[in-house]
Design a protein with these regions (language model features):
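Conserved beta-strand hairpin/beta-sheet module of binuclear metal-dependent hydrolase folds
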Residues: 1-54, 135-147
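Metal-dependent phosphodiesterase/nuclease catalytic metal-binding core
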Residues: 18, 134-144, 163-175, 242-243
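Active-site neighborhood of phospho(di)ester-bond hydrolases with catalytic His/Asp-centered motifs
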Residues: 28-30, 58-73, 89-93, 124-127, ...
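Active-site environment of divalent metal-dependent phosphoester hydrolases
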Residues: 34-35, 70-77, 129-132, 150-154, ...
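A short alpha/beta connector and helix-capping loop motif
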Residues: 40-42, 46-48, 155-169
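Core dinuclear metal-dependent hydrolase active-site scaffold
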Residues: 109-137, 142
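Accessory terminal helices/loops
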Residues: 167-244
Length: 244
């Protein structure tokens, strides 16, 4: 399931992902607001899990809460799950991420997460955030890239690490079935190269969230073209923003 925080609650309006396996579900990211009165994520997830279990009854079903990366607009509602039974929350720090997912050779190597009959590949993705992880769902072919790649402003904090991440993703896509590339925001308009200003709370002219491995190749070319530059550089479906 794909969820999105309402822009009337927080302008970042991040996307969140809830994936169901036979033994447990994965909630990927918890959004930009902590207060359940304004952003009742726990209540929403509990309802969705209960509805899924009505259709697929089984005892002892667990929930794992993890993150594409540790920026505040992706971890704010972690606390809503602190007292939830049969629930584990993976902290957003690098040590926590590598230990939880067996990524001891970071940033090299891949990890695996088995939800029970549904396996995800985990790809180290630093560059935007030092502990960013990209998740590939083998069941659907979705590549979940967090803030590393999406139709919007790609904030690059470490260009060498980010460039290596893009290469890892391209290598992965060359040998695995990837149907769609899904990030966690939409900040572009449908006019190529034109984004909504930061803080916008109404975006009626958004493009679709989904991108493709072809867009990753375009990103690789854009990084090469701007390798010795600073600042912002708009391209068709994204804007590079160098911060290092």
């Amino acid at each position: 399931m794909i969820l999105r925080q309402n822009k009337s609650v927080h302008y970042e309006a991040p996307f969140l992902f809830l994936l169901f396996g036979n033994e447990r579900a994965l909630l990927l990211d918890t959004g930009a607001s902590a207060d359940p009165a304004h952003f009742p994520l726990r209540e929403t997830v509990d309802r969705l899990v209960a509805e899924w279990l009505e259709r697929h009854p089984r005892p002892g079903y667990d929930l794992l809460v993890a993150h594409t990366h540790g920026h505040g607009d992706h971890i704010a509602a972690d606390g809503q799950f602190a007292d939830r039974p049969r629930t584990a929350v993976v902290g957003p720090g690098l040590d926590e991420v590598t230990a939880a997912f067996g990524l001891g050779e970071w940033p090299d190597g891949l990890g695996e997460l088995d939800l029970g009959g549904r396996v995800l590949d985990l790809i180290p993705g630093p560059g935007h955030h030092p502990a960013a992880v990209v998740f590939h769902d083998r069941h659907t072919g979705l590549l979940l890239t967090g803030d590393s790649f999406y139709p919007g402003r790609l904030y690059i904090e470490d260009r060498a690490a980010y460039s290596a991440t893009v290469d890892r993703l391209l290598d992965f896509c060359a040998t695995r079935p990837v149907r769609h590339v899904l990030g966690c925001h939409i900040e572009m308009t449908t006019t190529p190269g034109v984004d909504y200003p930061r803080g916008t709370t109404y975006q009626p002219d958004e493009p679709p969230l989904q991108l493709t491995p072809g867009h990753l190749r375009a990103l690789r070319a854009a990084l090469d073209e701007t390798a010795d530059r600073q600042g912002s550089h708009p391209y068709g479906e994204f804007v590079l923003v160098y911060r290092d």
